Curated annotation (Swiss-Prot):
Keywords associated with the record: Hydrolase
Family matches, as InterPro entries: Metallo-B-lactamas, RibonucZ/Hydroxyglut_hydro, UPF0173, UPF0173_UPF0282_UlaG_hydrolase
Keyword field contains tRNA processing: no
Protein family (similarity comment): Belongs to the UPF0173 family.
Domain of life, per lineage: Archaea
SUPFAM superfamilies reported in the protein's UniProt record: Metallo-hydrolase/oxidoreductase
PANTHER family found in the cross-reference section: UPF0173 METAL-DEPENDENT HYDROLASE MJ1163, UPF0173 METAL-DEPENDENT HYDROLASE MJ1163-RELATED
Organism: Methanoculleus marisnigri (strain ATCC 35101 / DSM 1498 / JR1)
A Pfam entry, by short name: Lactamase_B_3
Protein name from the UniProt record: UPF0173 metal-dependent hydrolase Memar_1421
GO terms, molecular function: hydrolase activity
Length: 224
């Protein structure tokens, strides 16, 4: 599977299908037209261009209902649920965050914030969404054993690097890719120490990607 970080919390997963997660793209454009879109929560910096893409979109029930009013073929689900879309398995996991749809007027409640474990072509990727650290991340390790963990590290609106180090240990994925940092001044981070500390004290590898950069991931790749 080819994983591409598109900046902020947006990733493309390309294998037998092309999936885009949280299609807010601060720089550049999508590397390929997605088959499926996944949205972790309703905030504008995650919902992004989901309406414009108008592809099959996996989202929490409230966001899915909103997208359907815009003509998007959305697939609703909720925390703990698992669905399969075009051969790709999506499990919705908890996240500790808020969620608000900004439409006309003051906006409205967007359901719970969430993460996803996405399994395609035998590879499992955990996208944590926007979240604080929580101890039940250990259950994600025990239940799903992800090959890759995509973790927010920017602080302010999510956990920062110190908490993300603990999250990486809880989840136990052999490869961690940081996200949700450096997009805005409030979430500026220098992650060199984060990478050094994790790689010195665990067997986990950290990939610090630049927007638009891709890596190959899978059970045989993550631990290299």
């Amino acid at each position: 599977m080819r994983l591409t970080w598109l900046g902020h919390a947006c990733f493309s997963l390309a294998g037998s299908r092309t999936i885009v997660i949280d299609p807010f793209i601060p720089e550049g454009s999508l590397p390929a037209e997605p088959d499926i879109v996944a949205v972790t929560h309703a905030h504008a910096d995650h919902l992004g261009i989901a309406t414009e893409l108008s592809k099959k979109t996996v989202a929490v029930n409230e966001v899915a209902k909103y997208l359907k009013t815009k003509g998007v073929p959305a697939e609703p689900m909720n925390l703990g649920g698992t669905i399969t879309v075009d051969g790709v398995r999506f499990t919705m996991t908890p996240a500790l965050h808020s969620s608000w749809l900004e439409d006309e007027g003051p906006g409205f409640y967007g359901g719970v914030a969430a993460g996803f474990v996405i399994t395609m072509d035998g590879v499992s990727v955990y996208h944590a969404g926007d979240t604080a650290l929580f101890s039940d991340m250990q259950l994600i390790r025990d239940l799903y054993r992800p090959d890759v963990a995509l973790l927010p590290v920017g602080g302010c609106f999510t956990m920062g690097p110190e908490e993300a180090m603990i999250a990486a240990r809880y989840i136990g994925a052999p490869l961690v890719v940081p996200m949700h940092y450096d997009t805005f001044p409030a979430i500026r981070q220098n992650l060199e120490e984060f990478k050094r500390t994790i790689e010195r004290t665990t067997s986990i590898r950290v990939a610090l990607l630049s927007p638009g950069e891709s890596i190959e991931v899978g059970p045989e790749k993550a631990g290299e």
